[in-house]
């Protein structure tokens, strides 16, 4: 085995230990109130201020049509302007979803306009900071405005559609 492959194997063994951790599995299962959950995606996402289209998902405020519990772990420090994940505040989000329900539009619409920036909050933090959130809340990937590059380990969990 090459040294490079050996390093990758050690890395994936570590991730396997993390994501097969009984406490993490129990947390996700309790959150969804079922044992029929899965990790549907694990990937690294790097963003910078050059060449990225920011007028499309995931850079627009939205909520996911499929419900996930997402884990976003910053692998680099994320300060203001570095593209931290951004959320609508609870009161505004609840009001928005009630309006969509009244119009019976919740299934069709998932991109929303936020004109009042006081109703959103960007999550910043040092590397290792984790944002864990239900995608029923309005959110977006933050736009990188600085010269830094945001690097995030993202893990999406959900109810396994094949078992539910």
Regions found by a protein language model. Give the residues of each.
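Double-stranded beta-helix
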Residues: 80-138, 162
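A short hydrophobic beta-strand segment most commonly corresponding to one strand
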Residues: 147-163
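Short proline/glycine-enriched turn/loop segments at secondary-structure junctions
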Residues: 142-146
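Short, conserved beta-strand element in jelly-roll/cupin
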Residues: 64-80, 124-125, 156-158
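Conserved hydrophobic/aromatic beta-strand scaffold that supports enzyme active sites
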Residues: 60, 70-74, 120-122, 130-132, ...
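Histidine-centered catalytic micro-motifs
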Residues: 58-66, 138-141
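Non-heme Fe(II)-dependent double-stranded beta-helix
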Residues: 1-61
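Short, structured patches in soluble enzyme cores that scaffold and shape functional sites
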Residues: 46, 73-77, 89
């Amino acid at each position: 085995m090459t040294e490079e492959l050996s390093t990758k194997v050690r890395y994936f063994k570590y991730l396997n230990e993390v994501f097969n951790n009984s406490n993490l599995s129990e947390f996700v299962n309790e959150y969804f109130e079922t044992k029929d959950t899965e990790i549907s995606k694990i990937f690294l996402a790097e963003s910078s201020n050059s060449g990225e289209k920011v007028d499309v998902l995931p850079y627009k405020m939205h909520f996911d049509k499929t419900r996930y519990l997402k884990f976003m772990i910053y692998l680099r420090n994320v300060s203001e302007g570095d593209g931290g994940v951004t959320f609508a505040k609870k009161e505004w989000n609840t009001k928005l979803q009630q309006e969509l329900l009244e119009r019976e539009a919740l299934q069709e619409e998932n991109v929303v306009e936020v004109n009042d920036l006081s109703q959103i909050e960007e999550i910043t933090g040092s590397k290792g900071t984790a944002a864990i959130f239900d995608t029923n809340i309005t959110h977006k990937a933050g736009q990188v405005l600085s010269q830094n590059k945001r690097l995030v380990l993202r893990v999406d969990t959900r109810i396994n559609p094949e078992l539910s």
